[in-house]
Amino acid sequence: MGDPKTPRRIWKKPKRPLNYDLLMDELKTIGTFGLKTKRELWKAHTELSRVRHQARSLLALGKDMREREEPILMKSLSKIGLVDKNSTLDDVLNLQVSDLLSRRLQTFVHKILYFKTPYQARQAVVHGHVM
């Protein structure tokens, strides 16, 4: 059962952390979105895999059960802006990590307020200049 005081880890490390292609892809994503550590990227990967797993399990269900459960998932994803209201489960399965990371406040600040780098946008958010 575990100790209720200690929180559960919300990220998973990659299976092969020293894969060159994976390292280069991670560094490119970290630089593009101004992430502080790779742990933030792993959190996004884990959250996206959780959502995609829910969509795959809905596809495996029967038609009546699927019609009842699918709007709940789609409503929650459209509420946070990952998919449109009239999208399907295939759109959920086609989501990328960049879609999830582009919903962060520092990414919006970087695009809208025209900071030179995403790291400057991150600093503005952390220091409370942008709320």
Where do the language-model regions lie?
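Extended polybasic, low-complexity segments that bind anionic RNA or targeting/receptor surfaces
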Residues: 115, 124, 128
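Ferredoxin-like alpha/beta domains used as RNA- or RNAP-binding modules
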Residues: 1-113, 119, 131
